[in-house]
């Protein structure tokens, strides 16, 4: 979906979280789209992060973890800083062959941020991307208490990689095979189409932002 939570080493949130409706990142979005030759929508986590850098926001130097809502909740329940590949692709572009963040683009971003002298590198502060079926941790005692303060819920329940609503909708409508798709008519209206191959070039109207084992595009 594209949400940005920023935390320091103590696990404290640095600024109020920024949602997919905070369209305040046009400068960063345009700059990163040009740098990567890949459409970076304003709502993506990486656009929010780079806009904070461009704005010279004081907290950026203290970032230890950047998360979406799904990654944040999973972290609180399991202690694991991981994210399903679909939601991870709404943070930063992913490599559909390696099923991980695109390393060449990470290197480009680190080069872009280098003159600012931050102690962190991008990959170090993002949740690890996991695909469906991979182990994503178990419910901890602390997590169980968050869900059920009465103590009846016990820890140890295995957890799957956390995902957002778009991937959930694709599974629910059985739209996961190539050349299939679905239309969401919720908070926003968009089509989610599973493509057969990469697009030949970036299009502002098409976000390549939801990938599990397929390449999907959402038209907003």
How would you name each of these model-derived features?
Residues 1-217:
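Glycine-rich phosphate-binding/catalytic subdomain of phosphoryl-transfer
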């Amino acid at each position: 979906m594209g949400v940005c939570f920023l935390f320091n080493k103590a696990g404290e949130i640095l600024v109020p979280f920024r949602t997919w409706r905070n369209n305040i990142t046009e400068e960063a979005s345009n700059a990163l789209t040009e740098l990567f030759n890949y459409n970076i929508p304003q709502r993506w986590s990486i656009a929010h992060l780079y806009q904070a850098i461009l704005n010279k926001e004081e907290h950026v130097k203290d970032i230890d973890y950047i998360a979406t809502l799904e990654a944040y909740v999973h972290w609180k329940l399991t202690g694991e800083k991981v994210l399903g590949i679909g939601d991870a692709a709404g943070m930063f572009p992913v490599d559909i062959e390696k099923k991980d963040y695109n390393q060449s683009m990470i290197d480009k971003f680190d080069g872009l941020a280098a003159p600012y002298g931050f102690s962190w590198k991008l990959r170090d502060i993002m949740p690890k991307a996991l695909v469906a079926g991979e182990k994503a941790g178990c419910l901890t005692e602390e997590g169980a208490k968050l869900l059920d303060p009465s103590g009846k819920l016990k820890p140890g329940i295995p957890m799957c990689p956390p995902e957002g609503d778009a991937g959930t909708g694709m599974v629910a409508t059985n739209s996961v095979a190539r050349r299939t798709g679905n239309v969401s008519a919720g908070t926003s209206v968009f089509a989610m189409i599973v493509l057969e191959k990469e697009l030949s070039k970036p299009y502002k109207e098409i976000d390549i932002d939801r990938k599990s084992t397929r390449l999907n595009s959402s038209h907003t």
